[in-house]
Amino acid sequence: MTGQERRQQLLDIGRRLFAERGFEGTSIEEIAAQAGVSKPVVYEHFGGKEGLYAVVVDREVERLSSMTTVLFEAPHSRPKFEAATVQLLRYIEDNADGFRILVRDSSPGAEGGTYGTLLADIAGQVEYIMADFLKSRGRDPKLAPMYSRMMVGMVAFTGQWWLDARKPRLEQVAANLIDLAWNGLSQLDAQA
């Protein structure tokens, strides 16, 4: 096995174990044993468990962050929100271990930590869409930061629940999220 292949093997094993047991519940010994190598091999590639975990988390953040570009591909607010909602749920469906690592010991509303920072970044992108939407409804666009966090939090928290429930189908969860958010937004009172 080449050095690059070994590194990827250790990343794959670490990702799975961190998702199952968390950072504290995973040991270098277990990672090395499952890879069929000695502990020094793990240290050689990553410097330790912290280094391996950091690379795993960075890759998941990068993977999820790259999906937020859909926010700017659709021409109108509702299609943008629909696309972003479906993308997040697809990420969860296709990368359950990675999402578990990101949300473990995290709160969707907290802006500290990797997951919270990622959600804050996404909410920042949603602010521009939300400001335009609020303006079109006669609302103060300065409320966009609050509304964007409401929207992102609603999707993120539902995504955490759906990660374990897996019912109803992804498309149905997305449709219901969009229905709740959009119909609620479409009825905003300009005076509130």
What does each of the following model-derived ranges do?
Residues Q9, I13, L17-G51, V55:
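Helix-turn-helix
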Residues R7-Q8, I28, E50, A54, ...:
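Short, structured helix-loop boundary elements
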Residues E62-S65, E111-K135, P145-R149, Q172-A175, ...:
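Amphipathic alpha-helical packing segments from all-alpha helical-bundle domains
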Residues Y91-G113, E127-A131, F157-D164:
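Amphipathic alpha-helical segments used for helix-helix packing
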Residues M1-E5, P141, D189-A192:
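N-terminal intrinsically disordered/low-complexity leader segments
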Residues E20-E24, N95, R137:
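Short coil/turn segments at alpha/beta junctions that flank glycine-rich nucleotide-binding fingerprints
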Residues V55, T69-A96, S148-M151:
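Hydrophobic alpha-helical connector segments
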